[in-house]
């Protein structure tokens, strides 16, 4: 068989995203490709193609950023790394004409964060990879799942929902703003007995990575009970940063304004042990805050990559919720909690481990999971479904 010439049209047609080769039982060598639309270095103004892999080359790692290398005389850029056989994560490319970002030999964490902040608006998904979506920061990303990545319940065999989600507008008097909210129901249980799940960052789970097929699949397979799901839009990053971190007004508005509006459309149970609040990052922090402060309404908490360092970003001080738990101002007694964090997000993992240690005396009702991943929705989507399964498992015993 004749080898294809690197950079030829037929060579590019043979590429369908990252390629990998097994090194041993635990590791793969993975190569990423990008085609320069301007052609070779003779014609192109592209100086760098940064590779942003969540949990591998992002600012959480405090490591030197990685740039692809051009194969001389071609339109081919490539970069090779090694990944665990069970790794899963998202990535994007950032082609740029600038060569002055990350110029320091070993940038510190804040320099890295600032550099990526400048670059990420230019990020693109991998054109060779059909699995792409708009990430939480607003830029396109693509999926990479290694051969032994853990099963993600519901996402492995999605099913089309019988009825679409209903989108409403919630006009809040308390918060003085308006936002979209999605209401989704599954199954055919008695309406007043249906458990309720409140999902934060609802626009992501409704539009960028819709959860409806996974929820429908798990309900049909009797891994989840028939339920009502309420997905709350964060509006934008400014509102999100104000409303989600430990904000009483937000949760009072949810309880006093939004939930009655939802209940008129899709009735659900008022029981705290049937009610889940789920969120990621600031949303994870917010979910636990809601459970700790209104346990009579929110009895189940699903927190993924929760920002428990807040409000001290440096990670050198205990976060506010940890302080409140330590002083006894709040108690997790009676709550069922899923706590999940990625080993590739060090500061968040450290804060979550400290929280888990604080909650450990209640270990019978705490589900603690470490994930081989970063601050990444591709990891969160599996944990979100598994968390709902774990938190609602007692409901199946109630019905038997």
From Swiss-Prot:
Main localization (coarse): cytoplasm
Enumerate the InterPro entries for this protein: AB_hydrolase_fold (IPR029058), Enterochelin_esterase_N (IPR021764), Esterase-like (IPR000801), Ig-like_fold (IPR013783), Ig_E-set (IPR014756), Mycobacterial_A85_antigen (IPR050583)
User: Can you say where in the cell this protein is located?
Assistant: Cytoplasm
Biological process annotations from GO: iron ion transport
GO cellular-component term (any): cytoplasm
**Which reaction(s) are listed as its catalytic activity?**
Fe(III)-enterobactin + 3 H2O + H(+) = Fe(III)-[N-(2,3-dihydroxybenzoyl)-L-serine] + 2 N-(2,3-dihydroxybenzoyl)-L-serine; Fe(III)-enterobactin + H2O = Fe(III)-[N-(2,3-dihydroxybenzoyl)-L-serine]3 + H(+); Fe(III)-[N-(2,3-dihydroxybenzoyl)-L-serine]3 + H2O + H(+) = Fe(III)-[N-(2,3-dihydroxybenzoyl)-L-serine]2 + N-(2,3-dihydroxybenzoyl)-L-serine; Fe(III)-[N-(2,3-dihydroxybenzoyl)-L-serine]2 + H2O + H(+) = Fe(III)-[N-(2,3-dihydroxybenzoyl)-L-serine] + N-(2,3-dihydroxybenzoyl)-L-serine
- The enzyme's main class, written as a single word, is hydrolase
Family matches, as Pfam families: Enterochelin_N, Esterase
Documented EC number(s):
3.1.1.108
Q: Where is the signal peptide?
A: none
**Which UniProt keywords are listed?**
Cytoplasm, Hydrolase
MF (Gene Ontology) = enterochelin esterase activity; iron ion binding
UniProt function note: Catalyzes the hydrolysis of ferric enterobactin (Fe-Ent). Is responsible for the release of iron from ferric enterobactin. Also catalyzes the hydrolysis of iron-free enterobactin (Ent). Hydrolyzes ferric monoglucosyl-C-Ent (Fe-MGE) poorly and does not hydrolyze ferric diglucosyl-C-Ent (Fe-DGE) or ferric triglucosyl-C-Ent (Fe-TGE) at all. Also hydrolyzes apo MGE, but catalyzes the hydrolysis of apo DGE very poorly, and does not process apo TGE at all. The catalytic efficiency for processing Fe-Ent is much higher than that for apo Ent, suggesting that Fe-Ent is the physiological substrate.
User: Would you identify the family this protein belongs to, as annotated?
Assistant: Belongs to the Fes family.
Q: What is this protein called?
A: Iron(III) enterobactin esterase
Recorded source organism is Escherichia coli O6:H1 (strain CFT073 / ATCC 700928 / UPEC)
User: What would be the name of the gene that encodes this protein?
Assistant: fes
